[in-house]
């Protein structure tokens, strides 16, 4: 499996476990589901999803902000997630490079290792989108 596939599978599996939705992403927990996280955990996940919807800022801008913040905070899973979301909403490679630049300026040289992994993930995600 590739890093991209590993990330997607891990995220899906653990989100289902945390949210108690079994095999159905987004489903309401039922009697056969594992209990998962608390109501507060589920509320936080819902708030996170709602925060990235269109508002005064569009989804594309919010995802780029999320990516820059994730790089500065040095969260590799968050970086991968936001790169994937950025590509899904039409952020160009050039725009991603500018987001990376902002993160480098704000976060400093400690961001460089995360930049390397971000570029690697971006390249793989883009190649998957181009593949038939």
Sequence positions of predicted segments:
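Short, thiol/selenol-centered motifs that function as redox-active sites or metal-ligating centers
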Residues: 65, 69-81
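Alpha-helical scaffold segments that form or flank carboxylate-/histidine-based iron centers
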Residues: 62-70, 99-103
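Amphipathic alpha-helical segments within well-ordered protein domains
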Residues: 49, 66, 83-87, 100
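Residues in soluble alpha-helical coiled-coils and helical-bundle/repeat scaffolds
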Residues: 52, 73-74, 91
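Iron-sulfur (Fe-S) cluster-binding segments and ferredoxin-like electron-carrier domains
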Residues: 41, 81-93
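Glycine-rich phosphate/pyrophosphate-binding beta-alpha loops
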Residues: 105-110
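Acidic, glycine/proline-rich low-complexity segments that act as flexible tails and inter-domain linkers
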Residues: 1-61, 111-132
């Amino acid at each position: 499996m590739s890093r991209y596939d590993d990330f997607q599978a891990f995220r899906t599996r653990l989100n289902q476990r945390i949210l108690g939705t079994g095999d159905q992403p987004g489903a309401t927990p039922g009697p056969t589901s594992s209990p998962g996280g608390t109501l507060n955990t589920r509320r936080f996940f819902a708030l996170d999803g709602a925060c990235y919807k269109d508002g005064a800022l569009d989804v594309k801008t919010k995802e780029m902000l999320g990516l820059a913040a994730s790089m500065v905070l040095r969260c590799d899973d968050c970086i991968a997630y936001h790169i994937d979301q950025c590509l899904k909403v039409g952020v160009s490679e050039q725009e991603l490079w500018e987001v990376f630049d902002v993160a480098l300026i704000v976060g400093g040289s400690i961001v460089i290792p995360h930049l390397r992994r971000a570029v690697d993930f971006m390249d793989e995600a883009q190649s998957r989108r181009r593949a038939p």
